[in-house]
Amino acid sequence: MVVIFTRNDALNINPQAGDTHLSVGGSDWLWAVTAVYLLSFLIFFALSLKPPHGEKIFHYLFTIGLLVGTITYYAIASGLAYSVIPTQRNRGHAASYQIFFAKYINWVVAFPVVILALGLLSGVSWATIVFNIFLAWIWVISYLCSAYTATSYKWGFFAFGTAAYLLLAFQTLHVGRTSARRLNLTRDYLMLAGWLNLLWLLYPIAFGVADGGNQISVTKSFIFFGILDLLMIPGLAFAFLFLSRKWDYSALNLHFTQYGRVNAGEGVFPEKRAPAVAAPVSAAPAATPAV
């Protein structure tokens, strides 16, 4: 492992800018995060070839999340996809701070992936799922705007994003739990949603001391964010895979990836079953009047 790290010359090939920027040690850590994402992606893709219940929806979702995470962390570990922004605080310590926008690209995909997975598990409506995804996008984009604002007005964007996060927490912990109770999946749902919201609670804190307040170094910020991201996407991916083995996919109405748009073989196709047609009731013949 030491030999591998000594070969890391990414920051020599891609020189860093800004008074506070990524260090070689930070790049080493980010390569390790990239490796975990890549390995998880390969495992998930392999498992999708023969999924339980014949359904691949959760495999598809987390495979996308893991692949995007691999690409974005590769970019960050290589010292790419960043901007240098003047700091609003600590001007005597560092006049500029390195902001990696690839991190936000990862979240724009990762947050909707877990939201969609939880929505499918809980059985909430598609309108609720779309609403939750837009809340996540508002959260991430507001934080991105905050990171790129060099004045104290950045905290306005931070407040908007945090408000969207609080709404999202309510949606996943209350609305989703209420819906999951109908399917007798309250325990599994609360385990997954509770873990996700515990991680989400730490993202505003991490942002506040990193890209927002510029209180910690770029390397320390990526140690913080890297752990959170690993526990969120790879962690939840394998948790979903483990718990889904005993879920009733028919009750969840998730039988829509084991066959194509055209029925080409045998399988469980609940939404293709036509409702039974009641037999018509014929009227009794009129009685012939007596003569």
Which sequence ranges carry the predicted segments?
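Hydrophobic transmembrane alpha-helical segments in integral membrane proteins
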Residues: N8-L38
